[in-house]
A protein has these predicted regions:
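Intrinsically disordered, low-complexity repeat tracts enriched in Gly/Pro/Ser/Thr and acidic residues
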Residues: 1-312
């Protein structure tokens, strides 16, 4: 029965290494200032100040960008309205549309450290569809709300690992699929950047787990299918068989019983080619062989009674 032990150490590590500790754009990206005037030196010498009215009652005002400043369209009141280029004190640059002195519409924001955001802005912050390019690390394509990922989006890392799914408050949250560079894959529910709820995990060796996850690891009821055809249906705790379960070697050979930390522990019913045997196990070792079914059921513990129907 040692052959039935669940995941290998490598498989267990693979489940845990969702790379969620890697860059999460919503957690590490820089907030875009909503107060443009606070980061502009307004004493730049104007090249020209054209007073002629445009068709939308605006005038063009060009301010030379010598390290810091703005070049673009201002209205009569001096507010930035329309297309412009804004350079900040830290070297960041915004190119795009303005409305009442704030980024509004489509634009590109170049961070001083090399990161780039291009997409929609609303009232000075990222909102709507946008793409974030983190230098040499990860790219995010998707929806934003108040400067963080919110809604459907995808991330692609430099090693070609990728995630597609839902985000909430800058974290993977909801339904999503994560594919590692070695083609290991998780499809299922997420909460606060970790696997939480129901999911399907495809190991690179062909094994598959379908079931519950808790805090990024296998916990609860699930089904583990080995690539060689063996199967386990039952409960897990900390990625090990723990509780009631059924282990199949083949259609004619299977065991119904209890497990603890991946070992048989408690009563079990063993069926092989229509022959039935009853056992009690202790830490993976047989401690008692029951003579018949009646003898077997007389030894049920209170905690085992609810599973009695599965042994009949």
């Amino acid at each position: 029965m040692n052959e039935s032990s669940s995941m290998s150490q490598n498989e267990s590590k693979s489940i845990n290494s969702t790379n969620c500790q890697r860059l999460s754009i919503g957690q590490t990206s820089k907030k875009i200032s909503t107060n443009i005037n606070s980061i502009i030196i307004n004493s730049q010498d104007k090249i020209s100040d054209v007073p002629s009215e445009t068709s939308n009652n605006q005038k063009q005002s060009f301010t030379e960008i010598q390290g810091i400043g703005f070049i673009g369209i201002k209205d009569k009141s001096g507010n930035k309205n329309g297309f412009g280029i804004q350079k900040m004190k830290d070297g960041s640059v915004y190119k795009g549309n303005f409305l009442e002195d704030k980024y509004n519409g489509i634009g590109i924001f170049y961070y001083s450290d090399g990161d780039i955001y291009q997409g929609e802005f609303n009232n000075g912050i990222t909102k709507g569809y946008g793409e974030y390019y983190h230098e040499k690390e990860v790219t995010y394509y998707g929806l934003w709300l108040d400067d963080i990922q919110f809604g459907i989006g995808s991330e692609i890392w430099s090693d070609n690992s990728q995630y597609f799914g839902n985000y909430n408050n800058g974290k993977k949250d909801g339904i999503g699929t994560y594919i590692w560079a070695d083609k290991t894959m998780y499809e299922g529910e997420w909460k606060d950047n970790v696997k939480e709820g129901f999911g399907i995990y495809h190991f690179k060796n062909g094994n598959i787990y379908k079931g519950e996850f808790k805090n990024n690891i296998i916990n609860g009821y699930g089904e583990f299918i080995w690539d060689r055809g063996k199967k386990y249906y039952g409960f897990f705790k900390n990625e090990k068989k723990d509780g009631f379960g059924i282990y199949y070697w083949s259609g004619e050979k299977f065991l119904i019983g209890f497990f603890k930390e991946d070992k048989q522990d408690g009563i079990s019913k063993y069926i092989c080619k229509n022959k039935i045997k009853y056992y009690r196990w202790n830490d993976g070792k047989k401690s008692k062989h029951f003579l018949n079914e009646e003898h077997f059921f007389n030894f049920f513990r209170p905690s085992e009674k609810k599973y009695e129907v599965f042994f009949k």
